[in-house]
Amino acid sequence: MTVIKSSINASKIMKYTGELPQKQLADLLLTSRPNVSHIQTGRRKMQQDIAITALNNVQSNLFKLALSHEFTELVPDVFSGKYVNQNPLSFLVMYEQEANEFSANIDAVMKILVKPASQLTTNERVSARNNLKELIDVLGWGYNLLFFASDYLNIDAYQLISEQDESWKQKKWI
């Protein structure tokens, strides 16, 4: 079941705020410095109202991605594992690799999607599920590429997405 959480342990994602002092973070989050300290250590959960303020006031795109993931899990988390090279070109290469893997199976996906869902065999459903997981990999790397490159280039990812929303509305896609 998909849920928007009322609060989260934000200690992991607070690292994406950079080297901002707690006092400055408190001002950005419209809360007290001790509350920021407790959120950073995991002693206190970050509430939705503080998260909303953080999304509006903290400049780090990676922070916004990680925060959005923690509250909804409908967007991917920041790919920051030990086997991920934190370089925009590495994100681009991984995105391309995953996109090519998905693209290689596009014919199989089409054969499944042209059939009514009620007529799919068990094997076709398993194949569809696996191909959708490949698509999730592509989207995960795509989101991470967008947010990492936006931070690298000092561009607001939210603004880019908002601009695309307008473009999609004009095209009558949404």
Model-derived regions, located:
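DNA major-groove recognition helix of helix-turn-helix/homeodomain DNA-binding modules
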Residues: 49-65
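Residue-level signal for the short linker/turn that defines the boundary of a DNA-recognition helix
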Residues: 8, 19-21, 46-49
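A short, Lys/Arg-rich alpha-helix, primarily the initiator
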Residues: 1-17
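Recognition helix of helix-turn-helix/homeodomain-like DNA-binding domains
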Residues: 30-45
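The alpha-helix within a helix-turn-helix
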Residues: 14-15, 26, 55
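Conserved hydrophobic/aromatic packing and binding residues within compact polymer-binding modules
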Residues: 10-11, 25-26, 36-39
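Helix-turn-helix/homeodomain-like alpha-helical modules used for DNA recognition
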Residues: 72-140
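Charged, low-complexity intrinsically disordered regulatory/assembly segments
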Residues: 112-174
